[in-house]
From Swiss-Prot:
Belongs to the universal ribosomal protein uS8 family. The keyword RNA-binding applies. NCBIfam families: PRK00136.1. GO terms for molecular function: rRNA binding; structural constituent of ribosome. InterPro entries: Ribosomal_uS8, Ribosomal_uS8_CS, Ribosomal_uS8_sf. The keyword Ligase does not apply. This is Small ribosomal subunit protein uS8. One of the primary rRNA binding proteins, it binds directly to 16S rRNA central domain where it helps coordinate assembly of the platform of the 30S subunit. Part of the 30S ribosomal subunit. Contacts proteins S5 and S12. Keywords: Ribonucleoprotein, Ribosomal protein, RNA-binding, rRNA-binding. The lineage of its organism: Bacteria, Bacillati, Bacillota, Bacilli, Bacillales. Pfam families: Ribosomal_S8.
Length: 132
């Protein structure tokens, strides 16, 4: 079966693994997925991410993060811009997620950025997802 939205698939795999408190998960790799995973790591939503070469597409192994009492760090993930309905914002329209408690991930001309980084650089782009 052809996958129409690999980013949504990655976010769903993270959401599902997080709900059952798995330590790690694997997703097929791509440059965009790798950059999104690096942002999640940098922002403290996941513990680590590593790329595994398999002479094909490659695999991203994502290590999930939980609090001291095994509470989830990621409480929500939502895909915003979809293949059937793209969502673009201008620099002054970059959204805040839960008043700054979450992040919006944007695809801009300067790469994949968080909402905060996009505001600092004064750039808009495609809103990929919200994470909180």
């Amino acid at each position: 079966m052809v996958m129409t939205d690999p980013i949504a698939d990655m976010l769903t795999r993270i959401r599902n693994a997080n709900m059952v408190r798995h330590e790690k998960l694997e997703v097929p790799a791509s440059k965009m997925k790798r950059e999104i995973a690096e942002i999640l790591k940098r922002e403290g939503f996941i513990r680590d991410v590593e790329y595994i070469e398999d002479n094909k597409q490659g695999i991203l192994r994502i290590f999930l993060k939980y609090g001291p009492n095994n509470e989830r760090v990621i409480t929500g993930l939502k895909r915003i811009s979809k293949p059937g309905l793209r969502v673009y914002v201008k620099a002054h329209e970059v959204p805040r997620v839960l008043n700054g408690l979450g992040i919006a991930i944007l695809s801009t001309s300067q790469g994949i950025l968080t909402d905060k980084e996009a505001r600092q650089k004064g750039t808009g782009g495609e809103v990929i997802a919200y994470v909180w």
